[in-house]
Amino acid sequence: MLQLIRACIHDKKSLLQFGPTAPKYAEVINVQTADIETQLTMPIRRSASGLIMPEDWCPVVESLSNNQKISYCIKHWRDGLSWEKSGAIDFHMKAIQVNGRIDHCRTRADVDQRLSRLDKIWQLAERTQKLKQKREVSPFSFREYGGILVHIDGQGNPIFGLGGQHRLAIALTVGLRSFPAQL
């Protein structure tokens, strides 16, 4: 319900300010996988989805290769290492120790279940050569809210917004040409 309220407010403001081609809140866009090379160093909240930034907006970015979650996923899915040897278990357990939870996980059993679910999603993506949009996964999803978060810089290049890291890792390791993303 909150997403719907945010969308109505955002979409109406954008329509009035920028016209009918303005981006919508949590709008789904199709991104070419090969075009994603950088990520933000600090996340921007998903609630800022669809905002048009000033022309001189210059976020601090770094190489996607610096992303720990994507790195351990590549080690697991592409290089064949176990989740344990890829560093995924240690990464999650340290985050749980510091923050109490990560990715809805609070225990080692939760982490194991999550990684098992990710393996199933990866297998489906490999078999079908696509990632499902959020609405295909859950009928209660609003647009692409919760998907791979992507921002577009002033030159039209996509920047990974640090949301949907495992899904992006799936797109990269399966070799998908493109994937759905939340703008």
Predicted features by range, described:
Residues 40, 57, 65, 145-146:
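A structural boundary/capping signal
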Residues 24-31, 35-36, 48, 60:
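Long, acidic/serine-threonine-rich intrinsically disordered regions with weak helical/coil propensity
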Residues 152-174:
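A sequence-level detector for short glycine-anchored, His/Arg-bearing signature motifs
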Residues 50-111:
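Extended, charge-rich helix/loop segments that form flexible
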Residues 130, 169-183:
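Phosphate/pyrophosphate-binding active-site loops
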Residues 1-31:
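Membrane-proximal basic amphipathic "stem/tether" segments
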Residues 89-160:
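Short alpha-helix boundary/capping and kink motifs at helix termini
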Residues 7-11, 67, 128:
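Surface-exposed polar/charged interaction patches
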